[in-house]
Amino acid sequence: LCIRANLDCVWVINEWDSIIPNLVSGNYDTIIAGMSITAERDEVIDFTQDYFPPSPSVYMGMSGADIDVDSAVIAAQTATIQAGYVAESGATLVEFATAEETISAVQNGEADAVLADGDYLASIIAESNGEFANIGEVSIGGGVGMGIRESDTELKAKMNAAISSMKDDGSLNALIKKWFGFEAATF
């Protein structure tokens, strides 16, 4: 995207729970961190068009467990669309700073299940030797886009043009398949 937009990008690592405040305060110019486009986030920042299509979120629990996700204790990473969804669902939400901690919470019995990005949990379930199972899916969010300050209209236009050109020539789909597998949703 940086090459297509003719920009010299410098990558910065930031904790998830402060990622939007640090964008708004000018510590960096964009967020490209798997951030789902939501109406709530769009009130604070702007988004490019999606560069990754929406994929379902997955509830993952211990294999064989009888879990009603509407009344269970559900772990989710803090400040994610999944945490927001659980908070509004009526289930009991337990939040953790990292996705890894949510999985540990299920393993140690602190939570009945975790709700997280399905693409992330698919490999964990597959590699768990039957310890974990997909116990349900839900679609939330509007795809993944770059977060940009609302005042940065020129940067948004450049990034949207770069994303559009990569969608048009198929290179974005090729990257999605390379990094997320041939089963991943594409444009």
Task: Locate the predicted segments by residue.
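Extended ligand-binding regions for polar small-molecule ligands
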Residues: 1-5, 70-71, 76-81, 145-183
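Bilobed "Venus flytrap"/periplasmic-binding protein-like clamshell domains
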Residues: 1-3, 35-36, 53-104, 118-122, ...
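Alpha-to-beta junction loops
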Residues: 6-8, 24-33, 107-120, 130-131
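Acidic, Gly/Pro-rich loop/turn segments at junctions of secondary structure
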Residues: 35-43
